[in-house]
Amino acid sequence: MAKIEKKQAVKNNQVLSLAEKIKRKALEKQQQAHANEPSPSDEDSAQSNSKDSNSNEQPEESEEIFESFTELDLVPELIEACKNLNYNKPTPIQSKAIPPALKGSDIIGLAQTGSGKTAAFAIPILNQLWHDQQPYYACILAPTRELAQQIKETFDSLGSLMGVRSTCIVGGMSMMDQARDLMRKPHIIIATPGRLMDHLENTKGFNLRKLKYLVMDEADRLLDMEFGPVLDRILNIIPTQGRTTYLFSATMTSKIDKLQRASLTNPVKCAVSNKYQTVDTLVQTLMVVPGGLKNTFLIYLLNEFIGKSTIVFTRTKANAERISNLCNLLEFSATALHGDLNQNQRTGALDLFKAGKRSILVATDVAARGLDIPSVDIVINYDIPVDSKSYIHRVGRTARAGRSGKSISLVSQYDLELILRIEDVLGKKLPKENVDKDAILALRDSVDKANGEVVMELNRRNKEKQARGKGRRGRMATRDNMDREER
């Protein structure tokens, strides 16, 4: 027993030794980084700078571009809210979508994330709500809980001077609490499709018979996540007469075209970008990683970019949890975001990262689209995504609203075909990142030992969890299972 404890103490000392070395080097880099860094600005401040607001998409010359929100014939309370939020100049998608929306047209909005599309549909809805206030006025469908919460925050901010009441109806939260919120007759409902369907079928006194606006945000992802059947049921329940519908998507696919034909009437198409692209301010590189060295390469990179706001993307929830724990064991400041966390844990992780209390977010693709995460400096693809769309959305977390950013992809021999497809979509070869191979190899033994400790601890937790979960397998699953981000 004493030998085992002594051996464990030696392993722990080796891990701590690596952490101390990293910490000493990190302190120097962090001081230098903070001395040279400009102060970060919120992503929404892009609306106050004309150069920033036009950085991601180029408007068509035939379309009118507005210089301020006062030109859009909005109610004074909404204009004042825009000023308070530093929304001084409409972004291209807002300039294109808001005028026809104010005239009552159905809208198809095609724009990338970070383009201001949430405000593009929130502003016309709130403007009309001011003239015709009634409960259950608008319903916004979103593919993820995090995006739904973000949309709610936008409505609350823009409607702050108008007495707007909103609620967020998503899986992973109490049905009873949500039912009580719905009974308070909010004006705006933001929901994931599965949970909305639960309430339409099971919550007494709740219906959307008088709904005036329906919005499907990130519609391409709604369909990718197999929400199609639930969307069909929702569309069959809510009224078509007297309803205005907005559909926003990053791309126009055959599925999106079928959905818009079934749900929209003579829509106005407002396209800012209809192809996948990355911004010029994003530097994209790759690192060819020999077998068994991916963890070591990652720790090397995190040490090189210490003090920078970094998102590490993984393909699986297990990897996200493991890498987050590995980073923390080596005294990096990390938190995880994935679908196995409950809603409070996910919100807490995002809040820690956005507030700068954690510099590293280790996430699955749940964080790749739609989330408002300001000032991300570095994106690292620990696992290469299986499709080019996911790559574009991942690296799009950085270099937003005119800022510079960097993405680095760790490429193994099994990823070569995937990276070739990505390069084909980008229309260019990704250069290799310059690395100090000797420094990487010097970290290998210590990183492997630390990873072994993490794997043992996670296995122990999983066994405890399985023991607690015995006897529950026979229970019927609810539609909460549809409000998931990883399949």
Curated annotation (Swiss-Prot):
Motif interval(s): DEAD box: 217-220
Enzyme nomenclature, EC number: 3.6.4.13
Name of the molecule in the record: ATP-dependent rRNA helicase RRP3
Key word Acyltransferase present: no
Gene Ontology terms: cellular component: cytosol; nucleus
Entry annotated with the keyword rRNA processing: yes
GO biological processes: rRNA processing
Protein family according to the UniProt entry: Belongs to the DEAD box helicase family. DDX47/RRP3 subfamily.
Residue ranges occupied by any Helicase ATP-binding domain in the UniProt entry: 98-270
Main subcellular localisation: nucleus
Chain intervals for the UniProt region annotation (Disordered): 22-67, 459-487
GO molecular function: ATP binding; ATP hydrolysis activity; RNA binding; RNA helicase activity
Role summary: ATP-dependent rRNA helicase required for pre-ribosomal RNA processing. Involved in the maturation of the 35S-pre-rRNA and to its cleavage to mature 18S rRNA.
Extent of motif Q motif: 67-95
Species assigned in the record: Kluyveromyces lactis (strain ATCC 8585 / CBS 2359 / DSM 70799 / NBRC 1267 / NRRL Y-1140 / WM37)
Domains: entry comment: The Q motif is unique to and characteristic of the DEAD box family of RNA helicases and controls ATP binding and hydrolysis.
Binding of ATP, residues: 111-118
Catalytic reaction list: ATP + H2O = ADP + phosphate + H(+)
Residue intervals of the Helicase C-terminal domain: 298-442
Annotated compartments: Nucleus
